[in-house]
Amino acid sequence: MAKDIKTAAVLGAGSMGAGIAAHMANAGIKVHLLDLPLDEGDNRDGRAQNGIDTQLKRHGFQRPEYAKLVTPGNTEDHLDRLGEVDWIVEAVFEDINVKRDTFAKVDAHRKPGTPVSSNTSTIPLEVLLGEASDEFKRDFSITHFFNPPRVMRLVEYVEGPDTSAEVNEQMHHVLERQMGKVVVDCRDTPGFIANRIGNFWMAVGAKTAFDQGIKPEQADVAFGRPFGVPRTGIFGLFDYVGIQLVPGIWGSLLKALPSSDAYHDYNIVERDEFKTLLDKGFTGRTAESGFYRGREEVYDFAAGDYRPKEKFQVGKDPKELMESGTPEGDYAKEVFSTFIKYCCDTAPEIADTVDQIDIAMKLGYGWKKGPFELADSIGIDYVASLFDDAPSLLTAAKNAGGFYADGKVLGSNGELTDLPNREGVIRVAELVAGAEEIAGNDDATVYKLTEGDYAGFGVFVYKTPMNSNSNAVTELWTHAPEWDLKGLVIANDEERAFSAGADLGTLAKLSGPEGDSEELARTIKQGIDGLHGARVAPYPVVGAVRGVALGGGMELVLHTDASVIHAEARVGFPERNVGLFPAWSGPVRLLERLVDLGVPNPHATAFGVLLNVRPVPAVNVDFWREHDEVIQSPDHVVEGALELVKKLADGYTAPADVELPLTTGTLAYTDGSETDKAIGEALAKVFTGDGTATEDELAQRQVDAATEVLKRQENHDRAVSMATTRKPLNN
């Protein structure tokens, strides 16, 4: 059975190799990072050390201290370390001879059975292995990470015909569960999936723009937001990747693909525009400029110099854009139709199901929807109408009702098939299907599971946008002690948010000099009572936290017995932006934790945390408790929470109300406006005084202070601004 690994080695300390090593360290793996020795000076490990230092500067490590888990070395003096590790990754230069020489050294020094993988993005596995031993072939695979490894969740995995089942299982476990990646199993074809498809899209976008006389900034607007493409667009992405890589990456695919492949129709390597930029050294972010210089200038090939960017506007709907008859619409239609045709024509060669291509484009290139999902959302009949002779896979999708129809996905052979399952990834909608609804309202439902390993346990599911805490939600929580459950997990399928906070509309309506202060006080008290209900329920409550947990959502996390939290979840208290401080006993729970942890000056520390509006990655939070689990995979937080609540249920006793010390010290917010200072003064009233305060006394302090500060016109204006525009008002 696969298990977590403790040690690894990465050979090659460039941007990718050092990035992989850094993210291994994020996952708690001790890493040996090896590169060629420096010839001069005493520090022969300088290249590897430079790789570590670069990752520290680029925030490849989630916490700076994780860099201590990476030991630098070199490939002459330290190959013996390979015999100590559980996994070896090759990330050296994309040269077959260099890689084969590296593999020979690895095979001579590794423990028998140690998995070895290559991070190649261009060389087929069959070519890589060459004359490797049978034992090496059984332990070998390709693990193609995307840069930067901390951020990009996609890993393309290629197994060979001789790769053992044990190695495949182990690699999937480490990549998915331990390192938090989404593994797409690929065939051993040129460019695998993401670069084969993504590079083609970029080439089509560039060549079509040049041929149609579409300006770079015009192209990036046209095939940008309407299609769910990141704001870089196509030309901005070339700058980001580095234009100097075009001859190597795009050129290598041209050499690897047969002349019949449509890739050859979009040979940007030979385009004068790319040659011009390369000749001038305008390579994008690796230089001072590329297609763009800064944010306001773009290269004009006719003039041979940079000019101010022009402003172009298009609508949000891709179909309306493609039918608009405008230059932008005609360009977008040509790019999209060419791209979706290539995806359809290529799918049988590179993928088993179309969702593999969609996942690759979403996680490898940042698209909101993959090309096949996009085709379904635009309308499969319309997409088919773009062709006189539609690709066979597109015709199959039309006949099936879409690439995704009836809860299934189209295989690359044109047949509908079940969506593949990833081990340990639980969809809440499927989990609660058939479960008993024991409580709920329009904004949330509490389910009691009746079958399987989690029978008797409950799931709290929001139904509000971004899982916000409306009055109906907080009222529902007040009844938590009444629910007949073994334990409760707070979970949902909304990847963007555990809970984005309180219902801002209510605050905006009730606050201000003319607002209903009594109703405002009741609303705040109900929030306190609701979260208190979650805390004192006679069963454990566990949060499955991913996306964001902000404001009232983070206060709810603090009221759970424990949570399983994605390391990159953004957590914090932005209440100051809405004219308030966290007032649902978040201050109480945070102070309680800090006191229990023995933090010096806990009131001042809590004060600073509660008024810092900037969310931080959960991995950087220092007040998680013993039972809280911070993991790398957002897709496994639900499973983790269910397992944790089962463990906590045995012999569970609800926590008692607390009595906490107050402080006689000065707590003041001095950096902001008078409005910010007023919020700081209000929060200080909760924490300051002589002796101690009970839970009820602290609750009343919060209600009084929050109601008073929200009477101010300036604070009301902040609440209205956030509720109506989602933008903070710095008044």
Could you tell me what each predicted segment is?
Residues 1-488, 493-495, 505-539, 549-550, ...:
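N-terminal glycine-rich phosphate-binding loop for ADP-containing cofactors
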